[in-house]
Design a protein with these regions (language model features):
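Positively charged n-region of N-terminal signal peptides that target proteins for export
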Residues: 1-7, 99
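N-terminal, polar/Ser/Thr-rich
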Residues: 16-49
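Asparagine-centered strand-capping/turn motif at beta-strand->loop junctions
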Residues: 56-60
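Solvent-exposed beta-hairpin/edge-strand motifs
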Residues: 68-113
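Extended, low-hydrophobicity, Ser/Thr/Pro/Gly-biased non-transmembrane segments
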Residues: 91-101, 106, 118, 142-240
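Hydrophobic helix-coil surface modules that form long, contiguous segments used
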Residues: 191-329
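Zinc-dependent metallopeptidase catalytic helix centered on the HExxH motif
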Residues: 315-387
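Amphipathic alpha-helical substructures
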Residues: 371, 416-487
Length: 487
């Protein structure tokens, strides 16, 4: 997710303003999971009713007696222990007043038969299907009936100003690692999501005239007053949608990739479409070919700068012109770092956020016609980080580590400076240490070797060590553990 990282941060921090940021393991399961979701959107009540079919093949070397699903929309209900936004952001998230939503599961079956299931987890945000005997390699067919109450909020999951965002909206399988299912709740800082890749076929029936953006190849079927939009995607880490009867869509070709830009009102739509297409082409050259046939960029009411999903990104309609351009580029970089190459976003957010943020600098370096002084950009980022750590040292207790869980950052400001800003500085430092040729060779190897998988920090470090012939573990550790000196 993109939180605006601005050169003006230095000035803002100096004024004492709060930062404008948002607040190899068992995860490498073979691609054996598939989802089929048939959903109906009722725009009069802002509810979604859905039937979800999941085929899961046990890829682990252990018998499973249960399966866990995350129910992320549960965080938006009244009384949730983990609210989706920080207290200081509530008025910005809910301009019309706090409006609750959520998810209700009404039925679960296994193999077409009734089964044992319950709602659990630390915040009643997990679906547990129990009483199973699933040996390694065994297949499990599950069906889940659920209803969404979409809240009026400027967020990943919510609606505002005629646009509906459905991000992290359906029951999604948790990751099984270290002998247990991951049950991380919906933290308000960062992107508290972690999932393996799967194949998706998702249809959304909505009133005719509503335009739907989503993950994957798109097809539509009109039946009088309703239109069903169907998306298919293979080997993706998540699936998201956005819908509105006010969307305009423009398209461009980026080396064989169809780039779409959806917006309600944007006088510079063609410019932003071009930035998106240029980003796809630039990162394909730097890292390796874009992994999917299409990409949709959606300008939407959103509390933060942007949010990444496979083949679909949200960018906030409240950003300034320069920030909107940066958000588009940053979120598209996530198609390489998060969508294709996964990592644990809850414990190692610096891996994808740091690379995505540094990719913005690389984009401007490779596209000088955009008029951004890259040298000054890096210097300003360094200065803003040093100033932040000096001014907030009492609050953060001197902890400048980057390997904290999302819940261990004292605020989204702390999180952003240590995953985005310091993360970008880390990769700039690696580049200067190993040289351009080996730096980009390592990233290409990383992308090639870990697309469709979940990479651990040591996997990333090994790519740089192998390409450079240098021992870099201690170098990375000093940055990640917070012992490196930055001045």
């Amino acid at each position: 997710m993109k939180k605006p990282v601005l050169f003006v941060l230095i000035i803002m921090l100096a004024l004492g303003a709060l930062c404008v940021f948002a607040g190899g393991c068992d995860g490498n399961a073979a691609k054996t999971t598939s989802y089929k979701i048939d959903a109906v959107l009722d725009t009069s009540t802002m509810t979604v009713t859905a039937e979800e079919s999941v085929t899961f093949v046990n890829p682990y070397e252990t018998e499973l007696d249960c399966v866990y699903f995350h129910l992320y929309p549960a965080a938006f209900r009244e009384g949730a222990r983990y609210a989706p936004v920080e207290d200081r952001k509530i008025s910005e998230a809910y301009p019309q007043g706090v409006d609750y939503g959520g998810i209700a599961v009404s039925n679960v079956t296994v193999g077409g038969e009734a089964c044992a299931w319950e709602i659990g987890g630390e915040d009643e945000d997990m679906l547990l299907v129990t009483g199973l005997t699933l040996m390694p390699g065994d297949a499990l067919d599950m069906a889940i009936s659920f209803t969404l109450d979409v809240p009026q909020i400027r967020h990943r999951f919510g609606y505002y100003d005629g646009i509906i965002n459905l991000g992290n909206w359906y029951p999604v399988l948790s990751v099984y690692e270290d002998g247990a299912w991951r049950t991380d709740p919906y933290y308000s800082s960062g992107d508290p999501f972690y999932s393996d890749t799967a194949d998706y076929t998702v249809s959304l029936k909505a009133p005719t005239g509503w335009n739907v953006a989503g993950t994957g190849k798109i097809s539509t079927s009109v039946d009088g007053e309703t239109t069903t939009t169907t998306f298919t995607a293979e080997g993706v880490r998540d699936f998201a949608l956005s819908a509105s009867d006010k969307f305009t869509c423009v398209e461009a070709d980026a080396g064989g990739v169809t780039v779409r830009y959806y917006y309600k009102a944007d006088a510079n739509a063609e410019k932003h479409l071009k930035a998106g297409a240029d980003a796809v082409k630039t990162f394909s050259e730097l890292y390796g070919a874009y992994a999917y046939p299409s990409l949709s960029v959606v300008l939407t009411p959103f509390l933060y700068g942007g949010m990444e999903y496979p083949q679909l990104v949200y960018v906030s309609d409240s950003l300034s012109e320069s920030l909107l351009e940066e958000a588009i580029i940053h979120e598209i970089a996530h198609q390489w770092w998060y969508a294709a190459v996964g990592n644990d976003q809850i414990t190692d957010a610096w891996m994808d956020e740091g690379l995505a943020e540094y990719s913005v600098t690389l984009f401007y370096e490779k596209n000088p016609d955009y008029g951004v002084d890259v040298t000054n950009r890096i210097a300003d980022v360094m200065q803003s980080y040093v100033l932040f750590t000096e001014m907030y040292s009492e609050l953060i207790g001197g902890d400048t580590s980057m390997n904290r869980k999302l819940c261990d950052y004292f605020s989204s400001t702390d999180y952003s400076f240590h995953t985005y800003v310091k993360g970008a500085l880390l990769f700039d430092s690696v580049r200067h240490s190993v040289g351009d040729a080996k730096f980009f060779a390592a990233l290409k190897t990383y992308y090639k070797n870990y697309t469709g998988k979940v990479a651990a920090p040591d996997d990333l470090i090994a790519c740089f060590e192998n390409e450079s012939g240098m021992k870099l573990k201690a170098f990375f550790d000093s940055w990640v553990n917070g012992t490196v000196g930055l001045y």
